[in-house]
Regions:
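Active-site entrance/lid segments in N-terminal catalytic domains of soluble metabolic enzymes
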Residues: 1-216, 244-249, 287-290, 294
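Alpha/beta catalytic cores of nucleotide-metabolism and tRNA/nucleoside-modifying enzymes
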Residues: 1-24, 186-219, 223-396
Length: 396
């Protein structure tokens, strides 16, 4: 019997269809927010990546209406201190020990109404051990602890997540720009088809149990542009998780290096060096002062040329996957496991407030084209078509 009986479509293969009659007169009538962790936020979550979020900048994301997940590179005591305010990451072993400790059990018992938000952060989200740990946490703490976990690349996992009471399921494997799981390990499912099938699985679970499904769907990985966010939401995702988009913002926490864009490839090959942020600004200041003080045309020209060379350099941020060896060391490991991630700088392009405003504007515009007032309508009612020309027909 042939194994190749299914065809899968990725996000580039689909597009959203305009409704024939839209009741929406102006896009500002559309509501682009969802509630998560007790907050009204955009349906976009910041990935738990060491070069994007830490204990110093997580509030910046929250202030701009993006839920975030504090990564495992932050020390465990800090994560424990933050988990009633924001989602924080734990390994499976950490979750299995921490949340069945006497300290946590007594603290939750003595503080009724207290909420904790955790992300059990691992790549392989269909392990039976993961289901067992999540089910046990829910049996002890119920809705007091909200659990996010994953990742999954099969719609058949949805019923297991819902039965275990898991609140958020991260979907996609190997699609992130710094993840090499699919390219080296070959486990992958085209994302548009996966979301569509998982949404069908959610509807089936609700029909079988005659109640709303407890597990929200998070599309996680490889989001390149605003239209990818909209497609994921239209195909059934409740939230979309991004790393690259936030790494490119001024507010991300990763180290910045200044590089001449024309020499970027040579920088990656180690042929030229970049300049640290501190050194870059010191050189700009020093050369600017020398230019002001120059007293001959020759010196003026020399300092101006040097200053122009420095101004041609642009800020790039260190950006690596959380399974690469450097990330392994940041999370307390030896960094000697086979890497399933890569490191490659991204350009720093915008303040997050500007990106958020654009994301919101494009999202509510698309919602108005679909005739949907809120994100549930958008998820349930928007028509999506297979586009055999791919995104080449419109992506600029």
């Amino acid at each position: 019997m042939s194994k190749l009986t299914k065809i899968g479509y990725d996000l580039d293969d689909v597009s959203i269809v305009q409704t024939p009659i839209s009741p929406i007169r102006h896009r500002n009538e559309c509501n682009p927010y969802r509630t998560i962790a007790g907050r009204e936020m955009y349906p976009v979550i910041v990935s738990p990546m060491a070069t994007v979020t830490d204990e110093h900048n997580y509030k910046t994301w929250l202030d701009n209406k993006f839920m975030c997940v504090v990564p495992r590179s932050v020390d465990i005591q800090t994560r424990l201190n933050l988990m009633n305010e924001v989602f924080v990451s734990f390994s499976l072993d950490e979750a299995d020990s921490v949340f069945f400790s006497k300290t946590i059990i007594e603290d939750m018992a003595n503080n009724p109404g207290k909420k904790i938000y955790i992300c059990i952060d691992l790549a392989h989200g269909t392990m039976s051990a993961l289901y067992d740990v999540c089910r046990n946490i829910k049996n002890v703490f119920g809705p007091s602890i909200e659990i996010m976990t994953g990742n999954v690349a099969t719609s058949e996992a949805y019923s297991f997540y819902a039965d275990a009471g898991i609140d958020y399921m991260r979907c996609f494997i190997g699609s992130g720009s710094r993840c090499t799981t699919a390219s080296n390990g070959s486990t992958f499912y085209p994302r548009a088809s996966l979301l569509d099938e998982i949404n069908d699985a959610r509807i089936k679970w609700e029909n079988d149990h005659d109640k709303p499904a407890p597990t929200k769907i998070i599309a996680d990985g490889g989001i390149k542009n605003f239209d990818d966010i909209q497609k994921c939401l239209a195909l059934g995702a409740d939230f979309v998780m991004c790393g690259n988009m936030f790494a490119k913002s001024e507010e991300a926490c990763g180290q910045i290096v200044y590089i001449n864009p024309e020499e970027f490839d040579d920088y990656l090959k180690g042929k030229v060096k970049g300049a640290s942020e501190e050194y870059y600004h010191s050189q700009i200041k020093d050369l600017t002062n020398k230019l002001k003080e120059s007293n001959t045309p020759e010196r003026t020209k020399m300092f101006q040329n040097l200053l122009d060379e420095w101004y041609r350099m642009q800020p790039y941020r260190e950006y690596f996957g959380m399974s690469c060896r450097k990330a392994q060391r940041l999370m307390g490991g030896l960094g000697n496991k086979t890497s399933e991630g890569i490191s490659r700088p991204v350009p720093v392009e915008y303040p997050i407030a500007k990106w958020a405003d654009n994301m919101k504007s494009y999202l509510i515009s698309t919602m108005s084209y679909a005739g949907c007032y809120d994100l549930d309508e958008f998820k349930n009612n928007t028509e999506v078509i297979i586009n055999f020309s791919g995104d080449k027909a419109y992506r600029k």
